């Protein structure tokens, strides 16, 4: 369980308009947990957004792939984020450089209060590939998918790419939020 509270506690970032509770790999992680150029990696995990889950209209990230090193390391390469809207939605965001675009999105309601299994496959490199599939665990039905066989998945000066999971959300519209407990399970990182 990843707990997040709307009232101030110790889950603030350097910027006080946002908060995070995440796990991630980092430079001291074993090499097989770090994405490197010309490598294909499969990330798998399960997660559940609880009944009544409330997203920020700004961002509520639940997963990111982020470069370490180089001038673009502050901008995530891929982001799964939920967003308050009409209707609320799940978005897959991508940034080749320092500008993010939405690659795909779906209504959030069918993803609430169900266990989901995610399979994300990425080939890191300037001639990269990316595929993500989110299925409902109870019946294996596909809730979200996206695939691209010609996408840039490496940044100049990057040392490696690290995955992140948890809750990272904006507090700019805190009135739209509540205390949350996001559930994750069965993390897997496999090099092919």
Where are these regions (language model features)?
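Low-complexity, Ser/Thr/Pro/Gly-rich disordered linker/stalk regions
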Residues: 1-116, 122-192
């Amino acid at each position: 369980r990843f707990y997040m509270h709307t009232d101030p506690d110790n889950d603030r970032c350097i910027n006080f308009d946002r908060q995070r509770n995440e796990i991630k790999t980092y430079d001291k992680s074993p090499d097989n947990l770090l994405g490197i150029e010309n490598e294909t990696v499969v990330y798998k995990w399960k997660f559940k957004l609880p009944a009544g889950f409330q997203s920020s209209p700004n961002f509520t990230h639940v997963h990111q792939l982020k470069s370490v090193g180089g001038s673009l390391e502050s901008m995530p390469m891929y982001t799964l984020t939920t967003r308050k809207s009409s209707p609320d939605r799940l978005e897959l965001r991508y940034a080749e450089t320092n500008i993010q675009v939405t690659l795909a999105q779906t209504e959030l309601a069918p993803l609430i209060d169900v266990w989901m299994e995610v399979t994300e496959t990425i080939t890191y490199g300037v001639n990269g590939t990316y595929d993500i599939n989110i299925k409902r665990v109870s019946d294996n039905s596909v809730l979200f998918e996206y695939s691209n066989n010609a996408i840039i998945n490496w940044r100049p000066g990057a040392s490696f790419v690290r995955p992140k999971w948890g809750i990272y959300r904006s507090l700019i519209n805190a009135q739209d939020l509540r205390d949350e407990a996001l559930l994750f399970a069965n993390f897997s990182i496999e090099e092919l």
